[in-house]
Amino acid sequence: CLEKGVSTIFFSATLLPVQYYKEVLSGNQEEYAVYVPSPFDASRRLLAVGRDVSSRYKRRNSREYWKILNYILTAARARKGNYLVYFPSYAYMNEVYSLYQTMGEQQDVEIAVQSGNMKEDDREAFLEKFREKRERSLAAFCVMGGIFSEGIDLKGEQLIGGLVVGTGLA
């Protein structure tokens, strides 16, 4: 299908390694590629992995959901701020959120949840939560690949962390 155009531009922050994708997408190693360094200081990045949990279908049960919720709350309590939490599906996200609701009001962590039928006003209201001054942490539950996975701009302290539940590796 690429032959029909005069040129094609692939734009992504995730197409690494570039040489591999140049071969797969165009077959021509001579294609032009631009490498842009990350604007984020790598020394300020923390990567933590919960090895005792899994998002595999056969392990999806309330015990796993409780462990995942505990990880989310622990992260959000460690430093007050706004966090995005990505889940592999709405069903998985809603299971974890249902458990949170049974705990009663958490004094130090507020949860916001993406719904599957958000209109533009709903999306704006969801993102506005990150701009509000708040007394407690916000953990915003979203779905991987959904409307809040790309193309949002949360600057400075509007977003201080991200958590991914189920990377497909465990």
Tell where the protein language model's regions lie, with residue ranges.
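ASCE RecA-like P-loop NTPase motor cores
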Residues: C1-A170
